[in-house]
Amino acid sequence: MKKFVTSIPNLLLTFTLCFVLSSCSSTGVKMSESSPWETIQFEDQSNALDIDFIDNNHGFLVGSNRLIMESNDGGKSWEKRSLDIAAEENFRLLDIDFKGSEGWLIGQPSLVMHTIDEGKNWTRLSLGKLPGQPFLVSTVDDGVAELATTSAAIYTTSNSGETWEAKVSDPSEQGGIRDLRRTSNGDYVSVSSLGNFFSTLESGSDTWIAHQRASSKRVQGIGFNPDGNLWMLSRGAEIRFNDDSNDLESWTKPIVPILNGYNYLDMGWDPEGNIWAGGGNGTLIVSKDDGKTWDSDPVASNLPTNFIKIQFLEKDELDAKKGFILGERGYILRWNG
């Protein structure tokens, strides 16, 4: 009798797990036979946080601890550079963006720099008392840029940063943000700092619109796919897609390709339309059938790093997309597909 009673909790747990798994799409993951990525390891153990290229060969990478590196061979090799800022100021360089020879660089705390000569010289600009810290910068046109902060405030400049004008009238309802993306046409999407909701801002609008998360799981990240629809990464290694940009409350069932105790931190689409998702402890998976099945990447799985950002760069100045995956502790991957 005692044995029967103690088995009841186990049965309940089994039924609960069956119910939970039935509400998800668990695909299973096998290891790919080959990889389109090559590993680059820097001596500097700082974390790479963003990368951009001016043309096919010339680009910059920025990261924590004032890290800035330059490549002149398409990202195959990198050389460390320095910025003209006081040695005692330790900045976390978050974002860099170029359009032609003009570029913008932002960091925390309160750093904005501007170049008009492909990064040979950088000018530090005064921000004044903006709400929040710089989070994302976008080069729009000659002398024109948009700056988003950690409080979801967005500012624009049309005179190379001499003055900034508020684009969002009142971001106070947003609170802080943990993720924020912008499309080339000026649409934004963000995730609240706690991951309990996400918000959208259409180009030309001055008001964020808040949306409920797709489930009780907190949102890790959100972004746009090549068609302009949204994807969502949630706690518990869940992946979701929104197929209708007119209904942002409608999401696919959660896809859970692999349960290894690590969440996915970013997603990206390669030039062939394959979907890549990266996360903790060398987790990097790819789907070649729109998320139905997934494979694990053999190069990434052997690296002692967390993959925090997946970038496929596409702009007029580039003959073809460039791909990089940024990891922690001096690791990045370069696309060779």
UniProtKB/Swiss-Prot annotation:
Tree of life domain: Bacteria
Record protein name field: Photosystem II assembly lipoprotein Ycf48
Compartments, record wording: Cellular thylakoid membrane
Residues of the signal peptide: 1-23
Subunit (UniProt): Part of early PSII assembly complexes which includes D1 (psbA) and PsbI; not found in mature PSII. Binds to the lumenal side of PSII complexes. Interacts with YidC.
Membrane topology listed for this record: Lipid-anchor
Family membership noted in the UniProt record: Belongs to the Ycf48 family.
Annotated function: A factor required for optimal assembly of photosystem II (PSII), acting in the early stages of PSII assembly. Also plays a role in replacement of photodamaged D1 (psbA). Assists YidC in synthesis of chlorophyll-binding proteins.
Swiss-Prot/TrEMBL keywords: Lipoprotein, Membrane, Palmitate, Photosynthesis, Photosystem II, Signal, Thylakoid
InterPro entries to which the protein is assigned, alphabetical: PSII_CF48-like_dom (IPR028203), WD40/YVTN_repeat-like_dom_sf (IPR015943), Ycf48/Hcf136 (IPR016705)
One GO process term, biological-process aspect: photosynthesis
Gene Ontology CC terms: photosystem II; plasma membrane-derived thylakoid membrane; thylakoid lumen
GN (gene name): ycf48
Lipid tethering residues (N-palmitoyl cysteine): C24
Lipid attachment residues per UniProt (S-diacylglycerol cysteine): C24
Domain comment as written in the entry: A 7-bladed beta-propeller torus, about 55 by 55 Angstroms, with a depth of about 25 Angstroms and a central pore.
